[in-house]
Swiss-Prot record:
One of its GO terms (biological process) is symbiont-mediated suppression of host innate immune response. The keyword Repeat does not apply. It comes from Andes orthohantavirus (ANDV). It comes from the Viruses. This is Non-structural protein NS-S. Expressed from the S segment by a leaky scanning mechanism. It is found in: Host cytoplasm, Host perinuclear region.
Amino acid sequence: MPRRRWRWTRMTLTRAHYKIDGQLCLHWRPNSGNSRDNLQIWWQLKNWLQNQLIQQGLSLMTI
């Protein structure tokens, strides 16, 4: 009986936002392999996250 192999699918973050109750909600989709789009999305997320933290009086030094 052949063993079942699990394949890791790289995921791309497409959207991030806060829900009404304050929880962070992340939207993912399978990676299409377009690394330029991927980079752009991560860059937008970084900027968005930075803005969220600044609004809350925090700063994100590591990103």
